[in-house]
Amino acid sequence: MKTLILFSTRDGQTREIASYLASELKELGIQADVANVHRIEEPQWENYDRVVIGASIRYGHYHSAFQEFVKKHATRLNSMPSAFYSVNLVARKPEKRTPQTNSYARKFLMNSQWRPDRCAVIAGALRYPRYRWYDRFMIKLIMKMSGGETDTRKEVVYTDWEQVANFAREIAHLTDKPTLK
């Protein structure tokens, strides 16, 4: 069995999570390829038994390239076992780590034609020193309003790697949908 893991990232944390998922799946005996949804032209769907897509939030929105990819490939995504993970800083709060309690994931799933079999909401990373001035200012303002870290010299990884490992185990059990050839 082979899994395609696609990601849409702004600052790299969604890519790190995708790589971690691939590593966890490998330990479970499942081969996985990882690719950036912004750079992949057309996936070779017939080479995969399942697909996982992760996307990050910036200023309340997923990247348009991710949304366009999902819209374009919704029929294919629905025809095979699939999973979605949303990465955002709101999920640093444990009560905001489910598709039901995270407004970004909930809104995306309600409005999307894609119906993934599994979903996760995973906390991202706050990397102030890597941000451009404007992003550092805006994210600090948002974090101040939401009770988060405001020291712009810090980098904080909120990702719960055990949650990611558990999600990999869920992905490993995705089966039973016929794939389109």
From Swiss-Prot:
GO terms for molecular function: electron transfer activity; FMN binding; menaquinone-dependent protoporphyrinogen oxidase activity; oxygen-dependent protoporphyrinogen oxidase activity. It is a peripheral membrane protein. It is found in: Cell inner membrane. Anaerobic activity is inhibited by pentachlorophenol. Disruption phenotype: Loss of protoporphyrinogen IX dehydrogenase activity, grows very slowly unless supplemented with heme. Accumulates intermediates of heme synthesis such as uroporphyrinogen III, coproprophyrin III and protoporphyrinogen IX. It catalyses: protoporphyrinogen IX + 3 a menaquinone = protoporphyrin IX + 3 a menaquinol; protoporphyrinogen IX + 3 a ubiquinone = protoporphyrin IX + 3 a ubiquinol; protoporphyrinogen IX + 3 a quinone = protoporphyrin IX + 3 a quinol. Its EC number is 1.3.5.3. Residues 3-172 form the Flavodoxin-like domain. HAMAP family: HemG. Catalyzes the 6-electron oxidation of protoporphyrinogen IX to form protoporphyrin IX; under anaerobic conditions uses menaquinone as an electron acceptor, under aerobic condition uses ubiquinone as an electron acceptor. Anaerobically in vitro transfers electrons to fumarate reductase and nitrate reductase; transfer to nitrate reductase couples this reaction to electron transfer across the cell inner membrane and thus ATP synthesis. Neither mesoporphyrinogen nor coproporphyrinogen are substrates. Under aerobic conditions in vitro forms protoporphyrin IX using ubiquinone as an electron acceptor, is able to transfer electrons to cytochrome bd oxidase and cytochrome bo oxidase; transfer to these oxidases couples this reaction to electron transfer across the cell inner membrane and thus ATP synthesis. This is Protoporphyrinogen IX dehydrogenase [quinone]. It comes from Escherichia coli (strain K12).
